[in-house]
Amino acid sequence: MKYPFMATRGVITFIGNSSTIEVGRPLSLAAIDLAKSDFENKLVLIPQKNIKQNEIEFEKDLENVGILTKIKSIKILSNGNRKIIVEGVERIKLDSIEKDKNNNDIIANLSLYPVLKNENGSSETIIEKMQTSLNNIIESNLPLVANQELSKHESSERYTYILAHYLTMPFEKKFEIFAKKSLTEMLELIFSFLVELKNIQKLDVDLDKDIKKNLDSQQREYLLRERLKVIQKKLGDDENDEEEIEEKLNSKYGKEQYPEEVIKTIKNEKRRLKNMMSSSPEANTSRTYIEWLTNLPWRKVSVDKTNLVKSKEILDSYHYGLKEVKERIIEFLAVMINNNKKHPEDEKTKIQIPNSDYEINKNLFTKKNASDDTYSYKSSNNVPILALVGPPGTGKTSLAKAIAETLDRKFIKISLGGVKDEAEIRGHRRTYVGALPGKIIQAIKKAGVSNPVILLDEIDKMSSDYKGDPTSAMLEVLDPEQNVNFQDHYIELEYDLSKVLFIATANYYQNISAPLLDRVEIIELSSYTSLEKIRIARDYLIKKVLEQNSLEESQFKISDESLDFLIKHYTLEAGVRNLQRALDKLARKIVVKSLENKLEKDFVITSEEIVNLLGVIKYTDDFKENYERIGAVNGLAYTQYGGSTLSIEVTTFPNSKGGIKLTGQLKEVMQESAQIALAFVRSNAKKYEIDFNFEANQIHIHVPEGAVPKDGPSAGVTFTTAIISALKQIPVSHKVGMTGEITLRGKVLPIGGLKEKSLAAHKLGIKTVFIPNENNRNLVEVADEVKESIEFISVSDYDEIFENLFGKLSDNKKITSNSKIPKKDISKANPTH
């Protein structure tokens, strides 16, 4: 006879018994489909000789005895596998294997291999012997359903199959029983296995007397741990834990620290815990929950410093500049001091914890009325939620640490980069295995107070997926109107975050969602100028480098000129991280020289020494093109890494289709900007005396560094100038840069990031920058050293740029690298309000 077959690993099914098998191998799935469609759900199971082997070569890898089964049910799993339940029908012997119509080796040629029954009653004799001497062993090693079936067995054959099927034993042993020819031989093997099992259990009972010395280290450790549990229970350690919690709740400060609702929840949970088995998973979950509730600080806060002079000194000791953010923190401190003066009654609600810098603030977790469901707060308790936005290396994280030290508060950092799951913020519900509170509650527990400074690092790097949107969860955290009633899914009680000072950091505020951006106070940390970097290196970085490398000041003498050389030729960044790395590398080289006795007592680091120690110069003053070309113009860009220059190139060539071609990974807005620029030039070709056949030639616009995606409308005037330069065949000086959005009517619209863009122009050596007239007010933000080296020309219409660069065609006036650009007096331009 022929039936589809499936190789099994570690599964033996006896006649009349059912087995559940998860199937995933392609041939096995094909055999199931064939059995279902053509063989009335009949499927042969043949055990593999090696259960660890995944791929088999059939006859040589299979046992020659198997069982014909009937498939009772099939369930498709989420991973594509199937779970089948089969019932044993007949024992068979495998003769050969052949292919099905799909060329799969899944058809087995079989012959029946029935179990021989002894007629002399030997089977019944063995069964009676088992029931007399081994009944306790049988009952304790079989599930309830198997014991029930044994009690009502109809034949010795059925009794044998039930025992063999349900007893837990090694696969090899079970197959040995399965393959025996006669029922008596099967029973003899089962009997010997049960006797062996009985002896093992007897050894366990007499463990301390007989084989304690022979226990291996793992068994001994397990035994000791089990005994320790019993000893702890006898000594009442669990009761001690309960007493500790009770003492904490009922102490003088505990009653004030924990809100009534929290105490009530803890007591209810303790009552539930008493009714649970101590070893049950629910009990462990309950104990962990009680620990979290008792270990959270609730009304416990640290005492804020209120000395404005000392606070200013601390902020200045950490960072150079950053006037705006320092002023904001001083304002917050001033308001807090003023509130304490105006509302002295608030001090009565604070209880100082003896011999500590902490106090209990009874204003926290307070309801206006007993009937209220949520907590209330006073407006004077509002704490600013700051977002420090700036390029990498500009001191955002270290500034947050300085703020924490200024306020004398605990500082906790939460990294949000790559967070995709809402539960990371709000926590998991306690029904999940291994559930924990979210990052906010974990940070507060770690701080041990309810008013820490929490740094939400890289808030612009959060993203969402099918698990939820963590950005939306952050809305509740960062909204002063809502965070007084923040609810974590694990804690399930409202937690007042109104005293927490949240400081978020981001590289690019455009990457922060609009609702989240609306809830924070943006403070921009812009790129540093060369002079600022020199000052930072002199006042902060060099001291740190000398300390880390154990060098004396005399061994690391470096002038401002050498620092400027190092900054310009070995770093190209908005912040100072690479500058610190370069200084650190110099220090390490000097340490090596010192240990090799190749260093003079006083070592002066000149520009020549920098090249000797750090190697070839990485960046030069003319690393961009330093000559004028037709159709090439310098644009200015603002990215999350600071300002940068953007060279735009235009060329033309004959093409009957005409039109425009754009390359350089330009995104949608920038593509539209280029198309608007071309449309403006075409519509004003006569006005600008452009003699060009647009229908017979194609215009190709390219922005170099094609691997980097680019977007934004601020390159509009640059596109326009590059197109006119290419069409009129008049070059534009490489010392000229520009930024501004252009309209179809030629109006120049304002742009963002002027400070960053002007710094990029300054680094490149650009001497003239055209900016939109409405950006005049932003010039006050530009560093003086930049304004001294760059002439800013404000324009409201493109005609003004054209007249400056190309002049009137009649006198062929144009700007070259050797000619002076006419200045416009912008010194009197006042910022608009």
Swiss-Prot record:
Class in the EC hierarchy, top level: hydrolase
Active-site residues annotated for this sequence: 714, 757
Major localization listed first in the record, in broad terms: cytoplasm
Chain sites annotated for binding ATP: 390-397
GO molecular function: ATP binding; ATP hydrolysis activity; ATP-dependent peptidase activity; sequence-specific DNA binding; serine-type endopeptidase activity
PROSITE patterns: LON_N, LON_PROTEOLYTIC
KW Cytoplasm (keyword) present: yes
Induction context: By heat shock.
Record keywords: ATP-binding, Cytoplasm, Hydrolase, Nucleotide-binding, Protease, Serine protease, Stress response
Superkingdom of origin organism: Bacteria
Pfam families associated with the record: AAA, Lon_C, Lon_lid, LON_substr_bdg
Subcellular location: Cytoplasm
Single GO cellular component term: cytoplasm
Reaction it catalyzes: Hydrolysis of proteins in presence of ATP
Domain Lon N-terminal: 3-198
SMART domains: AAA (SM00382), LON (SM00464)
GO biological process, one term: cellular response to heat
Family: Belongs to the peptidase S16 family.
Name under which the protein is recorded: Lon protease
Taxonomic source organism: Mycoplasma mobile (strain ATCC 43663 / 163K / NCTC 11711)
Gene: lon
